[in-house]
């Protein structure tokens, strides 16, 4: 029987162990998509308790606690103490066997705090106190956590109207780790509620200095902000979409649709789809002009629980995997940009694993030989960033594309304790490749190439691809 989470955790063969310990483990982290709060980095925030850094905003844990019968007040309530919340989480952990939360929890305790104990109700108080004692030390600040995990670059997720003041403050402080913004313009496409769209346009107008009264005005304002993001080091955009939008439209139609929604009138479903289609093209062209990488996270159905959405708002654990037929629209969107000669580097992330092979084959349609892996299949995302999900993504990419050109892992997380997800990914990658070598599916005489492949996927490919 193997020990739980020892140095060879998830590494089933001697080759896998060598690949990880001699190659993957030493590579710095490039976290090119995350949801860290930039102000915490700028201010070098000192966390008040393990509950704050671990449970605050973590909808993965909240979902598990609710499923385990824990009352909402211990997840998101304001009338419970940090210890009471943590105690309920500790009671839930033993019920998470085979859920990635169990592995993540113990990897984070081990790598951040040097704790090898299993978390359960018996050990909860001891672990809580020990972690809180360490969190009070300067080396456990927000920046300290990033240093601890050998992070080199992080890319946060930012709205076009954001001031980026904390990115600027962080850079000017001389902090050695790069924190770069990512352009996330979802609200500029959100025309379902006219009042919300109008309010956002007013914010965009104020921050850009462009008076907005037409579609062209809006695009001009967005371009000014796009330029500003570029000045602050931005190299990626990100789009959270249910599905791809590729409706046919005319400029006259889009102008009329803008005027209608800006004037406060609800749009038809057809008008909404046409507007979103136009905006994706506009954003794709902007990114191409600057040589950015565009990312698309698609396939989630969000805020499914109306009662809890009204109570807690978005991103609180009430989203799930959607089921959309989107291959034709995806191809049409990419083809339009490609035909115009304006298809920039692209990463496609699906939330439904049924689309793994769809994406893996879509990539090859638009690779043009200018950049290795120009169109990328993004790492397993959200519900899929666990061992099984990552293996399936890498297997599909291996079978239908080039795994060796993959830009690798990202946390997509709000937590400064999520960096062990890179280790989890690296161990999974090394186990896959190590098993293939041991099984004679990759020749042992090519082990140096395999070594290089591991280092490339863990770090080098992303470094070159994003030009950090």
UniProtKB/Swiss-Prot annotation:
Protein's organism: Phocaeicola vulgatus (strain ATCC 8482 / DSM 1447 / JCM 5826 / CCUG 4940 / NBRC 14291 / NCTC 11154)
GO biological process, one term: D-galacturonate catabolic process
Gene3D superfamilies reported in the protein's UniProt record: Metal-dependent hydrolases (3.20.20.140), uronate isomerase, domain 2, chain A (1.10.2020.10)
PANTHER family xrefs: URONATE ISOMERASE
Source lineage: Bacteria, Pseudomonadati, Bacteroidota, Bacteroidia, Bacteroidales
Protein name listed in UniProt: Uronate isomerase
Family matches, as HAMAP family: UxaC
EC number, as in UniProt: 5.3.1.12
Gene Ontology MF, one: glucuronate isomerase activity
InterPro entries (UniProt xref): Metal_Hydrolase, Uronate_isomerase
SUPFAM superfamilies to which the protein is assigned, alphabetical: Metallo-dependent hydrolases
Superkingdom to which the source organism belongs: Bacteria
